[in-house]
Amino acid sequence: MTQLYKLLPFALILIVAQTFAQSFEFEDETIDFPLTTAGSTASEATSLVNLTDETLTVTGFEFFDIYNKAAFAQPSTQGLPNFSGTEELLVQFTPTHNIEHSSLMVVKVEGRGSRAIQLEGAAQYTDSFYDSTFDLSEEDLKLSLTDLTAINYQSLGYNTGRDVLYMQVDNEKVNGQNADVNRIVGVYTGEVREGYQNRGQLQSDGFNCEHSWPQSLGASSEPMKSDLFHLYPTESTANSVRGNTAFGNVSNPEWEVGGSKKGGNRFEPRDEQKGRTARSMLYFATRYYSSTGIDFTWLSGQEQTLKAWNQDYPPTEEELQRGENIGDFQGNRNPFIEHPEFANRISSFSNTSFPIADPQIYVSDPSVEMGFIDAGKTYEYSIVIYNEGNQFVSVSNFEIEDQSIATFKQDQGNVNLAPGQFIELFVEVTPISSDPASTDITFNTNIAGQQDQVIPIYLNGAVGINDQNSEFFALELFPNPTTGLLRLKWDPSQIKPHYVRLFDVSGALAFERKIDSQFSARLNVSQLKAGSYFLQLEHDKGQTTNRVVID
């Protein structure tokens, strides 16, 4: 889980030379969304401003997960624009959780790097019953849910509880599933019983009551024993096989019937039951969190699996209706049926819940890809460094190894980034020739295993292509720019080509073809996206690289 904090009043920026103009920027520092109902979508706009005299191309957008899901996104219809002045960008806010949301949108521009804008929005549930859970997480949320699950609760007693279970809640004739006769399904094996008239007949026909939380581990007394939110009808043999075995995934089953399995001291319900079992267990652990006599240590080894099942098998309409039906009889509600996302905001159900330390650093550009640029002209490339974890992260010792290729000025020295905080690093490049060149940006963090960070800088064809030719070989490319067909022509007395390849600006291979002709080749590149590419011709003397533009 990643918990985000609001950005400090300003973004920390590593500034380049004072006379240097930025390539592009956002018109706003923050996009603020109105209070939004969870599950609905709000839209707001900002503008991206091109500060150069060239047309720039947006190559991508980055958004970040909040509790395993992105709340902010781009409309699917927006695309990746080319822009020469001001370009309006729409951002959508579709929250799942009733919390304050604080995140980033990072926009990536070909050959000019990345910029970030802060995104802020709050969400609420339509049901005021859960208002007390707003913006809560961990132990605070768990205690709030413990209180909520006790509201209006009425213990039915075990006999009445089973009567309600068999004749009402899971009886498909009366629970909304429209069976013609009394009909019930065993949750583990899928076996069906029809035409029974009462609990006694059903029990005589091999069915009984499964306690998801075993009676022997704390569910043998009232009100736990008869709490319908963790009780299910089962075929009695399957119930005995499960016993008080912990839930989990089974790879080598000793027993398997109807999709459920047992093996390796774990019991795995069939897929139809996994999500319901998970939400029953999380409910029980929350509802009776303050009760005595319950073995919560038994739960600890199952929590991650139960959370995964809760997420992978969301509530169906039948489960939602089942929850309402139970509420009609015993008065309370299961919050994990109505809002399964609550589970992502609680790190531990078996112990006191604290955020799990999760230091993470995001670097927008793993390398600086300047492409082919003119000698003597100054260019800027911007990089976003973002603390997307939940711990403070220090970033320090910024250096560029070869400052004849690129420079930056770091005014404020080393930086401690709070969770949710970012910096923008601006790099200034002024090539003195058109020859390929490369160097590295280096810096350090205090994250274990990520202490030494390296961002390579490539310009004028050095982008991972490794030109090996030590002398010039004439290669004609036409038309360039091209809209689909590209012709290559060379002097066969100088070189004998073997392969031609096209790389995008990130260095990824986009096109490859074997060359059979002695003098020329025609390439159909109409399937490639518009943009700049590096054409590499592999021949008997090494490699020759040229820039190609596809319109």
What are these language model-derived features?
Residues 124-187:
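N-terminal module-boundary/linker segments of secreted carbohydrate-active enzymes
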Residues 200-356, 367-371:
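Domain-level detector of nuclease and nuclease-like folds
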